[in-house]
Amino acid sequence: MERRFGLASGKEETLEAIGKSYSITRERVRQIENDAMRRLKRPNTLGEARQIFSSLAKHLDDHGGVSEEQKLFNSLADGRLHNHVNFLMALADGVTRSGEDDKYHHRWYTKKEAREAAEQIIERTIDKLAESKKPITRERLFGIMKDNARSLMGDSPSEDSLDSYLATSKLIKQN
């Protein structure tokens, strides 16, 4: 786990690199990693770390329940500790990592519904921006996002939440 998450060196290692050093396959390393995570997640193993996990979830909830990974890590710790934050997030119950794709950066969320709502708000905002094909101010962008949120969720998220949603998108850039 130390090498996989880069807890000592600050540099994460691939399954393949770890496997080569032990002369085992990367699939075997994956199995060992999964077993170690399962064991670490046992209720009697983590004890005092539960408070940290609930604080991480609350931090995410305070930002709309969704946050782009680097933005989240930067808001929680100095860069040299990001690997440790990543490890804690991976252990935490109630938070889930969503992988990167063509539209979105790596992101963490507390509830599937929050992630889906954020994605719908972003997608509707992209559609609206495509209609005008012109740059707009940040205030106007947030206005569009608030309108989309109201039509989807019935109310408007906070500025922090909208900023968090915006950071997840690869398709909307800010100048």
Place the predicted regions along the sequence by residue.
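C-terminal non-catalytic scaffold/interaction domains in large multidomain proteins
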Residues: E2-N175
